[in-house]
């Protein structure tokens, strides 16, 4: 079984650096990393960063595609980029998977042979978040400061022609027959830290779509 860790990115240089270093350290030798950059919206700095991580054996690879405000079509490029993989774990550039999940992912998949999609809990934190923001966006924030926990994300999916991303915005996986959810444990969650400035920028962008 081969898992492809599929990173989608634009110009998030600091976040992408952090993610790629983490993945390179923790990805199993039997797996690979695929990086997809928005060909119309990435900086030279981001391109050069990604190129530094590429390996001759293709275990870390990169491609370009236009986002064109269509997130599902963009993410479906991963099926070609990771054509030699059995499973895909899609991760946004500003997220971090847990090393515990990565260490145990092969075992989890092997113990659930009929599952085609796994929902992953996500810990969202926003530095600078105020009560005014929370009320405005109608968010739920727990005592740890996690926004909308467990905020399950469909990110680990079988590479199959029947299973595709759909939806230009707030895209999701469809075509799967059986889905499973990871437990709501911090050790298994995606981590998604942001600043309030970044959150406001993204909200403004989504409002234009």
What are these regions (language model features)?
Residues 10, 38, 122:
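Histidine-centered beta-alpha loop that forms part of the nucleotide-sugar donor binding/catalytic region
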Residues 64-71:
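Short, acidic/glycine-rich phosphate-metal binding loop used to engage nucleotide
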Residues 71-79, 87, 96-209:
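Catalytic-site signature of metal-activated, phosphate-bearing donor transferases
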Residues 18-22, 48-49, 77, 103-107:
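A short acidic, amphipathic alpha-helical/loop segment
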Residues 21-64:
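Acidic donor-binding segment of Leloir-type glycosyltransferases
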Residues 1-25:
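N-proximal low-complexity "stem/linker" segments adjacent to membrane-targeting elements
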Residues 3, 31, 86, 94, ...:
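Conserved acidic residues
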């Amino acid at each position: 079984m081969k898992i492809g860790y599929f990173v989608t990115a634009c110009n998030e240089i600091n976040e992408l650096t952090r993610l790629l270093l983490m993945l390179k350290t923790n990805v199993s030798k039997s797996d690979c990393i695929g990086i997809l950059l928005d060909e119309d919206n990435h900086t030279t700095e981001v391109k050069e960063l990604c190129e530094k991580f590429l390996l001759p054996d293709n275990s870390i690879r990169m491609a370009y595609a236009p986002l064109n405000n269509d997130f599902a079509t963009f993410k479906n490029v991963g099926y070609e980029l990771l054509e030699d993989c059995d499973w895909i774990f899609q991760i946004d550039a500003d997220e971090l998977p847990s090393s515990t999940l990565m260490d145990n992912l092969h075992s989890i998949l092997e113990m659930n042979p009929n599952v085609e999609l796994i929902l992953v809990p996500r810990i969202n934190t926003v530095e600078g978040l105020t009560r005014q923001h929370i009320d405005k966006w109608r968010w739920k924030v727990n005592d740890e400061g996690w926004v909308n926990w467990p905020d399950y994300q469909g990110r680990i999916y079988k590479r199959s022609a029947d299973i595709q991303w759909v939806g230009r915005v707030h895209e999701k996986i469809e075509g799967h027959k059986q889905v499973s959810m990871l437990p709501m444990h911090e050790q298994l969650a995606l981590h998604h830290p942001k600043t309030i400035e970044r959150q406001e920028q993204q909200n403004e962008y989504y409002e234009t779509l």
